[in-house]
């Protein structure tokens, strides 16, 4: 009798980034690591995803217009979602994580 390992779906990540190259790079990197990734270019797109998909992790550019609003809306729609803020990697900034 063969034993089967339980199936665990990959964590779902929402990448919110208005710079298309940054967004594509981050999303592709996460997909290579086995994450299921959704992308949004702005707060409105992100809220649409948050209303329809159970997101485990939200990764957003800290300089995004209405970023604070996005964090509030994310916590309202999905209180258990973790939020990570990033800065433009082309400027060699370090990723910063906000713990809630």
Placement of each model-derived feature along the sequence:
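His-Asp phosphorelay/catalytic-motif detector in bacterial-type signaling
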Residues: 9-10, 54-56, 77-85
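Short, well-ordered alpha-helical microsegments
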Residues: 23, 47, 67-68
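Conserved dinucleotide-binding and phosphotransfer motif residues
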Residues: 32-33, 77
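Acidic, metal-coordinating helix/loop segments flanking the phosphotransfer/catalytic sites
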Residues: 39-57, 95-99
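Conserved phosphotransfer microenvironments
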Residues: 59-78, 88-95
């Amino acid at each position: 009798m063969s034993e089967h390992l339980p199936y665990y779906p990959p964590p779902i990540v929402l990448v919110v980034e208005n710079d298309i190259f940054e967004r594509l790079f981050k999303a592709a990197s996460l997909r290579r690591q086995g994450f299921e990734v959704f992308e949004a270019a702005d707060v409105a797109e992100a809220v649409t995803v948050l209303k329809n998909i159970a997101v485990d992790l939200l990764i957003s550019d800290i300089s995004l217009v209405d970023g604070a609003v996005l964090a509030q809306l994310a916590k309202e729609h999905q209180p258990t979602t973790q939020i990570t803020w990033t800065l433009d990697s082309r400027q060699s900034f370090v990723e910063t994580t906000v713990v809630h």
